[in-house]
């Protein structure tokens, strides 16, 4: 039976919000029809104006909060409403954790039709100032005023700010110093539409445990006017600075970094650690942006893997090998599989750096490489997967099921694709036992989750 749409664009309606969507927006029902409302919270009664109507849902602009949630708080950031970096600053941290747990539970129930325990979210001791890496875009507005900050929601319009409240302070210091230098010497910001202008992005990277700081200036050309002044100012105003790097991106694209990098001052990488592992992090290398929460996530993966030192582990979508190496010290042998060649090179260097002789890294498609390992006599006891937001390819899941490990540990950054993939595994001889969400990105709508599956 065709659903009757009870609203039209421009309608003013009142509804009760009963949950949060995947982007942090409030979700409610009006005469049984789903309405999304940015800025609204669960258990709130709100008055909205309908701005968009589709076949199965509508979008409303929040006009008035008739009855506020007990968990509503005043956002701490002065540009929160304009900036797209955070979605949940108007919700208490306790409320954020409960909503994220519910988001995982709802996806598993609604999409995967699964009945498994979702544990309380592992929250952060410090939900602010956690990002060890920040990329600040630079732009000039129509009146010629320099803007450096973050993009507005779903746009490439730069919201100007002096500091990001979820970033480590050193990253903010880098951004402020480069801004002062650009203003003082009238250095141009890049224009995405025309392809003109020099400075595209300003990036900072912080070694949380080492204290090392790297400043990266991403430019559209090779020459940097008054470069020596920039370096001296960064050395003076950024505590812990050990590296200044230039990345050159000449392509007229919205991809942040180019392929060419040169060191302007100091080292080509900074050091940091996760648990007992140490890492060299270059300007372009992948590293978890929340070091403190990453350790909690990896420890949970280690707990679910239940290693005694005798097991063979395969880590699919292993990236730069952080999870592989985290498990290697507790396993007999670990194989990491990753299709991105530069990531595998980084993984091999990380294994060498940490003297993990029992970690081997393979560049290739997991659906092809898993059967090869099996044909070569490798029988994994545990398989770990840490796929991108789209989840695992079905051929990879089928290959894992065919290999028949005793346990599968699934690390997910998207509850919807997690639910879909767990449902597939349940149809292929595995049972999802427990899901542990981890809050890697406080103040945002993102949630990570570690799930244990065993052979049924």
Feature map (PLM): residue ranges:
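Short beta-strand micro-motifs enriched in acidic
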Residues: 49-53, 137-141, 205-209, 456
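Terminal RNA-binding accessory module
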Residues: 1-75, 79, 360, 368
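Flexible loop/N-cap segments at domain edges
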Residues: 202
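Short, conserved phosphate/pyrophosphate- and ester-handling motifs at nucleotide-, phospho-/glycolipid
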Residues: 43, 167, 290
């Amino acid at each position: 039976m065709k659903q009757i749409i009870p609203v039209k664009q421009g309608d003013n309606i009142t509804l009760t919000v009963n949950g949060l969507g995947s982007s942090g927006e409030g979700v409610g029902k009006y005469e049984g029809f789903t309405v999304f409302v940015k800025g609204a919270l669960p258990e709130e009664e709100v008055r909205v104006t309908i701005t968009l109507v589709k076949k199965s849902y509508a979008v409303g602009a929040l006009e008035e909060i008739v009855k506020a949630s007990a968990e509503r708080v005043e956002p701490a950031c002065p540009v929160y409403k304009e900036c797209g970096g955070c979605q949940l600053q108007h919700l208490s941290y306790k409320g954020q954790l409960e909503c994220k747990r519910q988001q995982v539970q709802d996806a598993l129930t609604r999409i995967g039709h699964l009945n498994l325990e979702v544990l309380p979210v592992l929250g952060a001791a410090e939900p602010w100032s956690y990002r060890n890496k920040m990329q600040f875009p630079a732009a000039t507005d129509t009146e010629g005023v320099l803007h450096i900050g973050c993009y507005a929601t779903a746009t490439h319009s730069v919201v100007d700010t002096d500091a990001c409240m979820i970033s480590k302070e050193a990253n903010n210091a880098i951004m402020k110093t480069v801004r002062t230098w650009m203003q003082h010497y009238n250095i141009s910001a890049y224009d995405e539409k025309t392809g003109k202008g020099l400075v595209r992005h300003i990036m900072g990277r912080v070694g949380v445990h080492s204290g090392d700081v790297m400043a990266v200036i991403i430019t559209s050309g090779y020459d940097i006017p008054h470069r020596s002044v920039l370096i001296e100012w960064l050395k003076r105003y950024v505590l812990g600075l050990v590296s200044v790097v230039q990345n050159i991106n000449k392509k007229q694209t919205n991809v942040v970094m180019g392929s060419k990098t040169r060191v302007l001052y100091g080292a080509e990488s900074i050091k940091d650690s996760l648990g007992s592992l140490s890492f060299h992090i270059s300007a372009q290398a992948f590293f978890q942006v929340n070091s403190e929460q990453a350790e909690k996530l990896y420890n949970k993966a280690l707990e679910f893997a239940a290693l005694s030192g005798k097991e063979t582990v395969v880590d699919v979508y292993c990236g730069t090998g952080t999870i592989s190496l985290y498990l290697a010290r507790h396993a007999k042998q670990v194989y990491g599989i990753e299709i991105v060649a530069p990531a595998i090179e980084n993984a091999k260097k990380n294994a060498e750096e940490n003297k993990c002789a029992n970690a081997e890294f393979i560049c290739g498609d997991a659906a092809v490489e898993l059967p090869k390992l099996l044909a070569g006599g490798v029988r994994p006891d545990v398989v770990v997967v840490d796929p991108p937001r789209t989840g695992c390819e079905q051929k990879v899941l089928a290959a894992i099921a065919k290999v028949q490990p005793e346990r599968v540990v699934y690390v997910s950054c998207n509850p919807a694709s997690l639910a879909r993939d767990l449902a597939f595994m349940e149809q292929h001889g595995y049972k999802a036992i427990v899901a542990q969400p981890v809050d890697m990105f406080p103040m945002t709508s993102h949630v990570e989750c570690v799930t244990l599956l065993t052979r049924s």
